[in-house]
Amino acid sequence: MVPKLFTSQICLLLLLGLLAVEGSLHVKPPQFTWAQWFETQHINMTSQQCTNAMRVINNYQRRCKNQNTFLLTTFANVVNVCGNPNMTCPSNKTRKNCHHSGSQVPLIHCNLTTPSPQNISNCRYAQTPANMFYIVACDNRDQRRDPPQYPVVPVHLDRII
């Protein structure tokens, strides 16, 4: 009885730890709206090299993000995808606010190769260019801080396919 209960408690703690890690990956810096944070993470590739481009994101999050995808398109083009038919989000089946791009776009996927928890400026990334479809989650804009020309805006890059 005791070993079974102990094992169950360990499994529960591991599950809660994984949920905490997963939840922390979707936290935006307070100075951004969700749409602004989407644009920063997935549209505004500040350098053609992942290592340099990821420094911007890592500095806001104060950690080395494991991976990130930059869509080589405009924010306006992604906003247009928000007008495509709604679908269930692949990463969260309870969300129905996702939209398929309908056409492939060039993108760069950055993958952390050299973590550096003590100094995030030393994190290094490999990059993989590709042409792929993507699925994006969209929500109504933040009335106070997002530009009024887009009533519905992208807030999460759910999947690349």
Swiss-Prot record:
GO CC field: extracellular space; lysosome
CDD domains: RNase_A_canonical
Alphabetical keyword list: Disulfide bond, Endonuclease, Glycoprotein, Hydrolase, Lyase, Lysosome, Nitration, Nuclease, Signal
Biological processes annotated in GO: chemotaxis; defense response to virus; innate immune response in mucosa
Keyword 4Fe-4S: no
EC number: 4.6.1.18
Signal peptide (from-to): 1-27
Glycosylation sites (chain numbering): W34, N44, N86, N92, N111, N119
Cysteine-cysteine disulfides: C50-C110, C64-C123, C82-C138, C89-C98
InterPro entries tied to this protein: RNaseA, RNaseA-like_dom_sf, RNaseA_AS, RNaseA_domain
Binding site for substrate: K65, N66, Q67, N68, T69
UniProt superkingdom: Eukaryota
Keyword check for rRNA processing: no
Subcellular location: Lysosome; Cytoplasmic granule
Modified residues (3'-nitrotyrosine): Y60
Reaction(s) catalysed (UniProt annotation): an [RNA] containing cytidine + H2O = an [RNA]-3'-cytidine-3'-phosphate + a 5'-hydroxy-ribonucleotide-3'-[RNA]; an [RNA] containing uridine + H2O = an [RNA]-3'-uridine-3'-phosphate + a 5'-hydroxy-ribonucleotide-3'-[RNA]
Active site: H42, H156
Gene Ontology molecular functions: lyase activity; nucleic acid binding; ribonuclease A activity; RNA nuclease activity
Subunit note: Interacts with and forms a tight 1:1 complex with RNH1. Dimerization of two such complexes may occur.
Family indicated by similarity: Belongs to the pancreatic ribonuclease family.
Protein task: This is a non-secretory ribonuclease. It is a pyrimidine specific nuclease with a slight preference for U. Cytotoxin and helminthotoxin. Possesses a wide variety of biological activities.
Name of the featured protein: Non-secretory ribonuclease
